[in-house]
């Protein structure tokens, strides 16, 4: 019993001793606080604590300061060591033989950096190199993006090897791990399914051509195959095959469905009715541009697919165009026709021609004759004394009037008095003339933009242009008729805004009065005032296009030498003629742009109101209704509204109202 107790006590003691002997030692912890410590001393301290051999590059210099309030285990202490060196621009290279090498970060990428793998990726700030193969993304396209996320100025580096489509990434293990995550998400195979899109109306080949053309910008961006949708035409079934990334594929399918629509017209011929333009005028324009359109379309097609000629005809009765063309050319022509078939603005051109003529003349002469000594004769008197004496002798002889005297008297104007006694004769002629001529014309005309318009009010005057006497003493005269009156020819061009360029030809002509003209057997004399010019004026503005202020003084004296110069008595031996004429001529013009029906109606109503007011003042209100049949002009009824009065006031400013 005693022996058994002793054995039991001895066994318990052995168990306690064994437990104490084989108890694991407590993990060693390190302090991580350094202040102003030389970096090499810091490296030596860590090397000693971790029991690692460290080789320090001679370029490693400096001091460090770091503070930690926690105790770190061996692994934490090593990562702390790597992080501190990283902050100060140094890196640690693990030589895989228990030796560590401390170098500058920029030199680490060319050192013997260990190649990491999925099994040994590295931890924290360890410098590692990783080889990453890519399957769906081009390495040359992804490398620039990854470089922006890596520390390229320090230990980081990202390069690509295009033949194998791999990335070579060097850097801190934590950074490389983040870059790997990005690569895995980007290098996605995607969905490469093929979708067949049947077509009901369009041609598969034409649709593929259009889609490919529209998709050129996407292709030029050099995206990988998974990001770009591909389209192929199946002409056998008239369908389009689409493959690619789902989003791109859906975008292409939606585009194809928009193109596959029924045409508005059947066949290639269409009748287009015009609203404003003249069909015959558009045919020449459209024929010219359609040949260019067809050349551009056919240049992109194979020879077997060339279109037929484009045919454009005009139907005058309905003012319509009949167009035969391919659908694509037809659409282009319709757009051009829509832009040409617009309501063109018009221009109301109003002109004022104001002319005042005033002429005064005085002819006075005395002629003497002596039967034996001779005579003084002045032809500017209109009646030579020799003709008068010969006629008087003829009359005294047989009581008849000679033809020469009759002709002279018929063409003479004024007074002629004298005596014929014995051998002496005297003839006094006198003529005073006064001519006044006032012209006020206010022509107006409306025309389309860029269309020439002519306004002509006058009469045709016969003019002798030739005379011929035949063998039978018959006289044949050739007569032409010359139009005299008021002519206005204008071509307006509306520029940007409301300015109008006017090409003007204006003429005011009349037949000169017999008393003031030099007419003879050659025919009448015409007074002509013409203006040909171009002016730029704003709509509604008045501009002077021409003017003339003319004064003419003519003083003629025919006299007997010496005797005609004697004061007072000399008047008996001379003939004088004096004429003073004045002429004032001004031409004004005012264009008004008319863009719509309301403006046209307003302008027409204003003209009618001004005309009616002028006639009322001239003939009296009681006769006005009898002169103008209101039933015929009910489209322009007289109204005393503000709108009509506003137009009338504008025209009154142009001197139309009451001065016709």
From Swiss-Prot:
Comment text on domains: The N0, N1, N2 and N3 domains are periplasmic, while the secretin and S domains form a channel that is partially inserted in the outer membrane. The N1, N2 and N3 domains each form a periplasmic ring. The secretin domain forms a double beta-barrel structure; the outer barrel has a diameter of about 110 Angstroms while the inner barrel forms the central gate with a small pore in the closed state.
Q: Quaternary form?
A: Forms a cylindrical channel with 15 subunits.
Positions the record marks as coiled coil are none
**Main location group:** membrane
The record's subcellular location field reads: Cell outer membrane
State the protein's name.
Secretin PulD
Cite the InterPro entries for this sequence: Bact_Secretion_Sys_Channel, GspD-like_N0, GspD/PilQ, NolW-like, NolW-like_sf, T2SS/T3SS_dom, T2SS_GspD, T2SS_GspD_CS
- Signal peptide location: 1-27
**What is the annotated role of this protein in its UniProt record?**
Involved in a type II secretion system (T2SS, formerly general secretion pathway, GSP) for the export of proteins. Required for the translocation of pullulanase. This subunit forms the outer membrane channel.
A GO CC annotation recorded here is: type II protein secretion system complex
Could you tell me the superkingdom of the organism this chain comes from?
Bacteria
- Species of origin: Klebsiella pneumoniae
State the family named in the UniProt similarity comment for this chain: Belongs to the bacterial secretin family. GSP D subfamily.
Q: Where is this region: N0?
A: 28-124
- Residues marked May serve as a pivot that allows opening of the central gate for substrate egress (site): 458
**What GO molecular function annotation could you give as one example from this UniProt entry?**
identical protein binding
* Chain spans, region N2: 191-264
Q: Which GO terms describe its biological process?
A: protein secretion by the type II secretion system
Q: Which UniProt keywords apply?
A: Cell outer membrane, Membrane, Protein transport, Signal, Transmembrane, Transmembrane beta strand, Transport
Q: Where is this region: Secretin?
A: 346-596
Segments carrying the region annotation (S domain) are 598-660
- Higher taxonomy: Bacteria, Pseudomonadati, Pseudomonadota, Gammaproteobacteria, Enterobacterales
- Segments carrying the region annotation (N1) are 126-190
């Amino acid at each position: 019993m005693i022996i058994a107790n002793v054995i039991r006590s001895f066994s318990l003691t052995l168990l306690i001793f064994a437990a104490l002997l084989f108890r694991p030692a407590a993990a060693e912890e390190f302090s991580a606080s350094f202040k102003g410590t030389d970096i090499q001393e810091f490296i030596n301290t860590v090397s000693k604590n971790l029991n690692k051999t460290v080789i320090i590059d001679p370029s490693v210099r400096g001091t460090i300061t770091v503070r930690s309030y926690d105790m770190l285990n061996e692994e934490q202490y090593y990562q702390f060591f790597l992080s501190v060196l990283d902050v100060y621009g140094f890196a640690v290279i693990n030589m895989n033989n228990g030796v560590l090498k401390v170098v500058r970060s920029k030199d680490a990428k060319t050192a013997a950096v260990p190649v990491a793998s999925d099994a040994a990726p590295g931890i924290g700030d360890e410098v590692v190199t990783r080889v990453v193969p890519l399957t769906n993304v081009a390495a040359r396209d992804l490398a620039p993006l990854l470089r922006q996320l890596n520390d390229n100025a320090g230990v980081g580096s990202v390069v690509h090897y295009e033949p194998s489509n791999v990335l070579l990434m060097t850097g801190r293990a934590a950074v490389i791990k983040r870059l790997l995550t990005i690569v895995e998400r980007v290098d996605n195979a995607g969905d490469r399914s093929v979708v067949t899109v049947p077509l009901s109306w369009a041609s598969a080949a034409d649709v593929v051509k259009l889609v490919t053309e529209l998709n050129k910008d996407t292709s030029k961006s050099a995206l990988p195959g998974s990001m770009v949708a591909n389209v192929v035409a199946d002409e056998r079934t008239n369908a389009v095959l689409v493959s690619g990334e789902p989003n791109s594929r859906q975008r292409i399918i939606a585009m194809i469905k928009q193109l596959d629509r029924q045409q508005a017209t059947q066949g290639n011929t269409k009748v287009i009715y015009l609203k404003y333009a003249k069909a015959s005028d558009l045919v020449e324009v459209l024929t010219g541009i359609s040949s260019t359109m067809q050349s551009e379309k056919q240049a992109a097609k194979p020879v077997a697919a060339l279109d037929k000629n484009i045919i454009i005809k005009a139907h005058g009765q309905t003012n319509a165009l009949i167009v035969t063309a391919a659908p694509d050319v037809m659409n282009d022509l319709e757009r051009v026709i829509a832009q040409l078939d617009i309501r063109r603005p018009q221009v109301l051109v109003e002109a004022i021609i104001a002319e005042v003529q005033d002429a005064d003349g005085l002819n006075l002469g005395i002629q003497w004759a002596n039967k034996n000594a001779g005579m003084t004769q002045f032809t500017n008197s209109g009646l030579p004394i020799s003709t008068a004496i010969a006629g008087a002798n003829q009359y005294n002889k047989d009581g008849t009037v000679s033809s020469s005297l009759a002709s002279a008297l018929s063409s003479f104007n004024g007074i002629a008095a004298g005596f014929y006694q014995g051998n002496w004769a005297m003839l006094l002629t006198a003529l005073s003339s006064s001519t006044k001529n006032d012209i006020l014309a206010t022509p107006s005309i409306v025309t389309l933009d860029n269309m020439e318009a002519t306004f002509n009010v006058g009469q045709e005057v016969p003019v002798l242009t030739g005379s011929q006497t035949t063998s039978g003493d018959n006289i044949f005269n050739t007569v032409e008729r010359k139009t005299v009156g008021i002519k206005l020819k204008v071509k307006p061009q509306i520029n940007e805004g409301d300015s109008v360029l006017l090409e003007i030809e204006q003429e005011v002509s009349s037949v000169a009065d017999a008393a003031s003209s030099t007419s003879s057997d050659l025919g009448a004399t015409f007074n002509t005032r013409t203006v040909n010019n171009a002016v730029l004026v704003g709509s509604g503005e008045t501009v002077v296009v021409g003017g003339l202020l003319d004064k003419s003084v003519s003083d003629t004296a025919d006299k007997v030498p010496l005797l005609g110069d004697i004061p007072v008595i000399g008047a008996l031996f001379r003939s004088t003629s004096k004429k003073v004429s004045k002429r004032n001529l001004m031409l004004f013009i005012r264009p008004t742009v008319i863009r719509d029906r309301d403006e046209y109606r307003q302008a027409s109503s204003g003209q009618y109101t001004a005309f009616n007011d002028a006639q009322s003042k001239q003939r009296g209100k009681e006769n006005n209704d009898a002169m103008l049949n209101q039933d015929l002009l009910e489209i322009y009824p007289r109204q005393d509204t503000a709108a009509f009065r506003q137009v009338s006031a504008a025209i009154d400013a142009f001197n139309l109202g009451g001065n016709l």
